């Protein structure tokens, strides 16, 4: 009896040690999940129809314009032509990538690759790795590179949240690679990240923190993802430089200093 108890104890101890070393959370790839007839499937189909109803050339217009190319259609209105131009294009890449992973729909696949090819054309036209739709982008980023920074909550050098805006492009390219397996998106993402390293390499940490007073979305997360994708630690350093100490340092100390902060900062 004692021998049996001893062996059982060893088995339980080994099982516990294995459980403690195992990942605490595991994810199902979207490709492995299929929805049955349900409100969830109805919602997915509604989303699918909306995604395909959008005109890709209108979403691409700001990116082509800023690259000095002729848009194939006028851009959308409201936020897409009043200063936040191009931000929906980044969201659109993410939506297409996830929808393709979830459904395998060929129309979604073709739409995603049309977007990526056109954006790549714009990226090549600029020649620095940059892709973006903020009006006056090239002048803006040259000012930032020169250390001329005028930052406020929704403003950076007179432009409407350009960091937040370009984060959507970064995230969209990342998702096109991770969810849809696009090697083109991976290279475009790396080139765009290398461009940001060039823009910010001459800025001090103080200048970086000053710039981050402007709404900047989750750029640090995306740069950390690029480090994971490539295995190159220079992108992890970029992620560190884009981490806003005003918000994060108090949290590290278990202090709540979030009152009055804008959620899209992080």
Predicted segment positions?
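Bacterial Sec-dependent N-terminal signal peptides
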Residues: 1-21
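Glycan-recognition and catalytic cores of secretory/periplasmic carbohydrate-active enzymes
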Residues: 20-266
């Amino acid at each position: 009896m004692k021998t049996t108890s001893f062996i059982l104890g060893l088995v339980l101890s080994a099982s516990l040690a294995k459980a403690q070393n195992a990942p605490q959370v595991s994810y199902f790839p979207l490709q492995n999940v299929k929805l049955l007839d349900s409100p969830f499937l109805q919602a997915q189909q509604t989303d699918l129809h909306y995604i395909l109803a959008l005109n890709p050339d209108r979403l691409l217009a700001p990116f082509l314009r800023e690259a000095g190319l002729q848009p194939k259609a006028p851009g959308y209105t409201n936020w897409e032509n009043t200063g936040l131009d191009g931000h929906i294009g980044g969201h659109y890449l993410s939506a297409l990538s996830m929808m393709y992973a979830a459904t395998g729909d060929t129309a979604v696949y073709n739409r995603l690759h049309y977007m990526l090819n056109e954006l790549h054309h714009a990226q090549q036209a600029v020649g620095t790795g940059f892709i973006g739709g903020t009006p006056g982008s090239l002048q803006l980023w040259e000012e930032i590179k020169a250390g001329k920074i005028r930052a406020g909550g929704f403003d950076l050098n007179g432009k409407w949240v350009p960091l937040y805006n370009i984060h959507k492009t970064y995230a969209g390219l990342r998702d096109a690679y991770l969810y849809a397996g696009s090697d083109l998106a991976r290279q475009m993402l790396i080139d765009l990240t290398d461009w940001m390293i060039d823009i910010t390499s001459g800025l001090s940490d103080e200048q970086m923190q000053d710039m981050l007073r402007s709404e900047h979305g989750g750029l640090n997360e995306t740069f950390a993802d690029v480090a994971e994708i490539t295995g190159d630690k220079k992108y992890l350093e970029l992620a560190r430089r884009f981490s806003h100490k005003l918000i994060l340092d108090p949290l590290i100390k278990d202090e709540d200093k979030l009152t009055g902060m804008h959620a899209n900062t992080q």
